[in-house]
Amino acid sequence: LCKMSKTDKISVNGKSYNWPTKPTVVICLDGSEPGPKGYIDTAIRMGFMPFMKSMVNKSTYEIGKCAMPSFTNVNNMSIVTGTTPDIHGICGNFFFNPEEGKETLMNDDSFLRVSTIFEVFENAGAKIAVITAKEKLRKLLGKNLKEAICFSSEKADVVNLKDNRIENVLDLVNKPLPEVYSSDLSEFIFAAAVEIIKKEKMDLIYLSTTDYIQHKSAPGGKLANDFYYMLDGYLSKFYELGCEISLTADHGMKGKTNEDGSLNL
């Protein structure tokens, strides 16, 4: 396939996208609740995200709406297809299968009804990398990809050219396989992306983390501050490598009810 011109637009599921003019890093930061009391604003205010602070006033910085229900898979697939759950088909973590009479996890890519932005851009000649924390999400995001680098930090020790289009990731990153329930699982994603961008000319890089830290720590807590300080360092590295950066979240961490038991909508 011939790579399309940078002036061309690509149509995916009824929406038009510009061809990247520089390596474009899109980060879905799992559970990173926005707003004045959210994780990033709090980390900036407390001095743990100096790079992010420097970018806020000269970049687009807005609060957007997430897809409902506000689950990880639902929102990741909404981001990467540009559609809503009723169109892309991933409408929850599981559903009740009336034919089998039991709950069925929606991790299989057969439930995805439309093409991802990755698939369409790859077919147009784009060089793409998709790196996730968890393997189950990697399988959904990587549907129909044939050339793109696509792996999870959870399974970084078993990546291979046939399935992931990359090998020896632990050596590339110079880090051990991270524990699943740790901040390291997300940091490995960023570290791997930096090395891949240094090594290859990429067009689109999608990184999706885990919300382990957000479940463990409220905004401003030590674990959260350490995590966002780490993230800030990698954002700075992506910027130094000439990347366009887009940072969003799949959902927040607010409770479903208020202290009096009323719904917190």
Each predicted region: which residue ranges?
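Anion (oxyanion) recognition and catalysis
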Residues: 56, 122, 239-240
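Short, structured active-site-proximal loop/turn typified by the sulfatase FGly-forming signature C/S-X-P-X-R
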Residues: 35-82, 127-129
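Catalytic metal-binding/acid-base residues of hydrolase active sites
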Residues: 32-33, 210, 217, 251-253
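Short acidic, glycine/proline-rich loop/turn micro-motifs
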Residues: 38, 216-221, 258
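Active-site-proximal N-terminal segment of extracellular/periplasmic enzymes that hydrolyze or transfer
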Residues: 2-59
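Structural motif
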Residues: 26-28, 204-208, 246
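Metal-dependent active-site segment of extracytoplasmic phospho-/sulfohydrolases and closely related
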Residues: 26, 51, 226-264
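His/Asp/Glu-rich, glycine-adjacent segments
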Residues: 2-3, 82-218
